[in-house]
Amino acid sequence: MAPNAAPALAGVLETALYVDDMERARAFYEGVLGLEPMFGDARLTAYPVGGRGALLIFRRGAANHTAHLPGGTIPPHDGSGPIHCAFSIAADALPTWEAHLAALGVAVEGRTEWRSSSGAARSVSIYFRDPDGHLLEFATPGLWPRLDFDQHGAKT
């Protein structure tokens, strides 16, 4: 490693979204996306996603003060306005997800077909919103080719 070079990061462990109504958010993330909470209370619900990370749903304003825990402290954080979060899905699952969202009245606001510099099809993304206006994305493999892994975490 070069002098003053940063050590390697192992991945993104958590992504946080901030919501106004925790019950409404849980109904969406559990009922529409099928996520199962690993922890939940009035302040925070945490969902495992893909076996490699967690989606944290905080009630807006609930984390804007220092949290004092037995093992230390967590600095304040919060977010306002629509935030973007993308989920990876299998290419053959895209039509099923589109039908599932439509059946539940969740509007797909956009669709992008990603292409390589040569024009070859690479990936497809669809975009929709949660009840708090956060922009969510389902992306098929190939959007970020260096990041494609199978369901077991093996590089494809």
Question: Where in the sequence are the language-model features?
Answer:
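Conserved beta-strand edge residues that scaffold enzyme active sites
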Residues: 43-44, 114-116, 142, 147
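Helix-adjacent hinge/juxtasegments
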Residues: 60, 65-90
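Short beta->alpha transition motifs characteristic of CBS
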Residues: 121, 138-145
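Core segments of cupin and vicinal oxygen chelate
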Residues: 18-64
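Vicinal oxygen chelate
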Residues: 20-23, 80, 84-132
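N-terminal beta-strand motif that seeds the catalytic metal site of vicinal oxygen chelate
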Residues: 1-23, 84-85, 89, 142-156
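Short glycine-/small-residue motifs
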Residues: 54, 135-138
